[in-house]
Structure formats: C-alpha cells, structure tokens
Amino acid sequence: DYHWTEVVMRDIPHSMLEGVALHHYSVIDWGKKGPAKEFSEQHYFQTMQRALLMDELISKHSNIMDKYDPGKNVALVVDEWGGWYDVEPGTNPGFLYQQNTMRDAILAGATLNIFHNHSDRVRMANLAQTVNVLQAVILTDEEKMLLTPTYHVMEMYNVHQDAILLPLNLKTNDYVFGNEKLPAVSASASRDTQGLTHISLVNIDSKNAQEVAIELRGGKYTSVTGRILNSEKLQDHN
C-alpha cells in the first residue's frame, strides 16, 4: 500500500521510526496456491513473476521514502517473503508445512539479489519462519531433519554479509513462456572485508542454460573460483 507508506513517512517523526515493514509472498492465487512439489512450468513461471515483483515494490516504496528521508535514515525492512503453496497432503493446514524444491532455491537467490541491489534502503530482510513453515531452510520429522535447497542458497550467499555492494550492469536474455517473458539471469555483486569480489548469478530460465561473460573493472584479479547449486529438475528436493 503505497499510500500507507506515504502517510507514515510524512506524518510520523522519523526519530520514532527505525524501519518500515514490507511483506510480499510469491503467491499465484490465494484460493488455490498450487502444489509445492508436483508443479508445472506455468506454475513455476507465475511464481517467479510474483517473486521478481519484489524489485518493483521495493523501488516504489523507496522512492516515496526518499521524498521524506533523503538521508535514508529509515530502513525498509522486508520481514516476510518467500514462496507460499498448498500444504503437504495429510498435514495440518494451519501449520503451513510445505516441501522446498529447486524452484525455491531459484526464488531465494533472485530475491536476495534484489535485496542486495537495494541495500541502500533495505537494511534488513528475513524469512518469517525458518523451520517447517513456508520457505523453510530446515524441515524436521520427529528426530529427523534435512537442509532444504533454500538453506544452501543462504549458505552460499553469506559471503555478501558485511560486504560492500558493487554496482553492475546486466544484459540478459529473456526467459519466454507463452506470450510472456522474464529476465533469464539475476545478479548481484559485492566486495568483502578481505578485498575479495563475490558475484551471485541465478539462471531463472527453466529450459535453457545461460552463457555468461563477466567484465570486471577497477581491480586486479589473479584467480577465480565458483560454486554451483543445481539439479536435474525444478521439482527436485531433499
């Protein structure tokens, strides 16, 4: 609600505001959210449409905040985000227990890239629940537990913590589904306290590999290492 943000930033003394909250879940239809595991490419594409909408939401709320807080003293806090699907069959619908697949890994990586690229205003973002609920990093069953694809994305992205955002220009192919399209690649970059540059790339296209060329400026680089999180199908899970 952009009007809500406008009124809050205009009428409440900023000395009383540490942050303004933004919630956004990647839900296709609140009445029929779709399965967490056995989903179609259409479900995947629509989920990613909703996920990438995060960039527009942050941009528009940030523009309003910039009018009243050009010094960016008040943070935009995205304290609820992630994929939200139908619960696993046989589980309590009130517990929101859902499986976590490679779709969720891609959603998480693309969303974290958006947060990184808006880090001048987004200074906190978190999953509302981390275990057994929605975009969980850990799933448990009695004494058993597993780490989800989302966990592995979070672990890979922790190199960006306490680092400095590096601006980037991204030219990408389109991921086309029917008559609609999304950018095929999502990216963000940072330099850590040791002077190492970290670049995170996400291939959103469910059908095609992406060849990526990276031009680095303003530094001397002597070696490169990389890690890839991948699986055969979007529906794969632990």
Where are these regions (language model features)?
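Distinct, well-ordered alpha-helical segments
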Residues: 2-11, 214
